[in-house]
UniProtKB/Swiss-Prot annotation:
This is Inositol phosphate phosphatase IpgD. It comes from Shigella sonnei. Contains the consensus sequence Cys-X(5)-Arg characteristic of Mg-independent phosphatases. Its EC number is 3.1.3.78. Keywords: Hydrolase, Plasmid, Secreted, Virulence. The gene is ipgD.
Length: 538
């Protein structure tokens, strides 16, 4: 795949670690210059040109992000030291130095220099000697800054084959009935970024992700979020368990919000039925920063909310008057975990801890004997009985899931890292359950799952069929995927969480054999680098 441009443009592109690997044809201070070949005619070229225009637009908006991030970060710690009565002269000098840079000139080296000054000054001016305590303080100061920003809805649009699609992302702070947030604890329009590891009331980084067609009709919706674990609290503590329970209740409330007709019925006093399929993307091993204990927190909290026979689950939700009202839900939750990073797919780690969990959940979703004899039961069979038109799609996805699991294909990349998690999420939506998916932060692996879902939903909407298993993306599908990666709202969510856009899934490793297949799935190094963005800064 080759990105082209009408005429011949030379455009400035951010250099440094964030965009390493871009094709350089000339250099200025701090930037690289990239040339694009001329293309004149053909339907195929229209798609390429549309992608190129989007690329150039994103490039323009991204160019100054590194400088803005550095300035914001310096100012945050300047104010923190000033508030504590410390000497701000060195931070101020760094701010003045940053003011001399032009857009596009700040790279990772400059951020490292800034972070070194911040660390030295916070230690000296606030009198912190312990290294771990210092790191915690620095992280908390910037987390508080990010959490004090307004988080609003993100709405993006793309065109494909003459059809328009809308991507609507609604943060938890805007999950409202009228002007009132539905949750027990108010968000007050703010966000809870992924670094909020001790947060006990809210899930970090929770969004309703919806896809609509050109008539505004929903063709997919689900909840994406950070892990249901206050993993900054002491492991196995009652405080941490209570926090997980609060987060799980908030997720169920968000799932109910995603189904307005059910929410309305529940608030009117009716007991409603709600099914949730939770698909986690963690790698639960001791090598992944505690993801094993995080998954345990999440699974225990969600399972603990399952309704017992004859005893609906009770939730508190704010109505349009802002009053808390108890609602009754016949709640059924199944929980999966499919690792999607290099440790899981290239080194085979983390599966031993989740195979049993996944097998149990498959029985609930597709029936006790499905993996053995292919007879669909469980929630899927119930859905077919209630809604016969979904039968073909359910069977198609179920058979792919069966093949993946029986052949253990989910434990390898094989050109499609999210093959099982994506199909499980699509099956959940197809049978009328609310799909929820998460990683640790809710921005990188979760964002890639979001993009993979959107690509597949658009394909299904246009062709009437889901992709075949083990099929490679065509050049046209790569262009669609690239468009979604650049214009689906994921970059905005990453920036809200860290201060800069960029997906950490995009990695270049010393051994290329350990890398995931996203270079191939995207098909263009410049777009790959743009999606990676400034993730190395954070």
């Amino acid at each position: 795949m080759h990105i082209t441009n009408l005429g011949l443009h030379q455009v400035s592109f951010q250099s440094g670690d964030s965009y390493k690997g871009a094709e350089e044809t000339g250099k200025h201070k701090g930037v690289s210059v990239i040339s694009y070949q001329r293309v004149k005619n053909g339907e195929r070229n229209k798609g390429i040109e549309a992608l190129n225009r989007l690329y150039l637009q994103n490039q323009t908006s991204l160019t100054g992000k590194s400088l803005l991030f550095a300035r914001d970060r310096a100012e945050v710690f300047y104010e923190a030291i000033k508030l504590a009565g410390g000497d701000t002269s060195k931070i101020k000098a760094m701010m003045e130095r940053l003011d001399t840079y032009k857009l596009g000139e700040v790279n990772k080296r400059h951020i490292n220099e800034l972070n070194k000054v911040i660390s030295e000054e916070i230690r000296a001016q606030l009198g912190i000697k312990n290294k771990k305590e210092l790191q915690t303080k620095i992280k908390q100061i910037f987390t508080d800054y990010l959490n004090n920003k307004n988080w609003g809805p993100v709405n993006k649009n793309i065109s494909h084959h003459g059809k328009n699609y809308g991507f609507q992302l609604t943060p938890a702070s805007h999950m409202k009935i009228g002007n009132k947030n539905i949750f027990v604890k108010e968000y007050n329009g703010k966000g809870i970024c992924c670094a909020s590891t001790r947060e006990s009331d809210h899930i970090a980084n929770m969004w309703l992700s919806k896809v609509v067609d050109d008539e505004g009709k929903e063709i997919f919706s689900g909840i994406r979020h950070g892990v249901i674990s206050a993993y900054g609290l002491k492991k196995n503590s009652s405080e941490r368990a209570v926090a997980a329970r609060n987060k799980a209740e908030e997720l169920v409330s968000a799932a109910l919000y995603s189904r307005p007709e059910l929410l309305s019925q529940a608030l009117s006093g009716k007991t409603v039925d709600l099914k949730i399929v939770s698909t986690s993307l963690l790698t639960p091993t001791s090598l992944t920063g505690g993801e094993e204990s995080m998954l345990k927190d999440q699974v225990n909290a969600l399972k603990g909310l399952n309704s017992k026979r004859g005893e609906p689950t009770k939730l508190l939700i704010r109505n349009s008057d802002g009053l808390l009202k108890e609602v009754s839900v016949n709640l059924k939750v199944v929980t999966f975990n499919f690792g999607v990073n290099e440790l899981a797919l290239k080194m085979g780690l983390g599966w031993r801890n989740v195979d049993k969990l996944n097998d149990e959940s498959i029985c609930s979703l597709l029936g006790d004997n499905f993996l053995k004899n292919g007879v669909i039961g469980g929630w899927a069979a119930e859905a077919i009985e209630k809604n016969p038109p979904c039968k073909n799609d359910v069977i198609y996805l179920a058979n792919q899931i069966k093949e993946i699991i029986n052949k253990k294909l989910q434990k390898n990349d094989n050109g499609e890292p999210y093959k099982l998690s994506q199909r499980m999420t699509l099956l959940a939506y197809t049978i009328g359950a609310v799909p929820c998916w998460n990683c640790k932060s809710g921005k990188d692996r979760t964002g890639m799952q979001d993009a993979e879902i959107k690509r597949e939903i658009i394909r299904k909407h246009e062709t009437g069929q889901f992709s075949q298993l083990n099929s490679k993306l065509s050049s046209e599908e790569k262009r669609l995927f690239s468009t979604i990666l650049m214009n689906s709202g994921n970059m905005e969510i990453q920036e809200m969480n860290t201060g800069v856009p960029g997906n950490k899934v995009m990695k270049k490793l010393p051994l290329s054999s350990l890398e995931l297949s996203y270079s191939e799935r995207i098909g263009d190094s410049k777009i790959w680098n743009m999606v990676k963005g400034y993730s190395s800064f954070v």
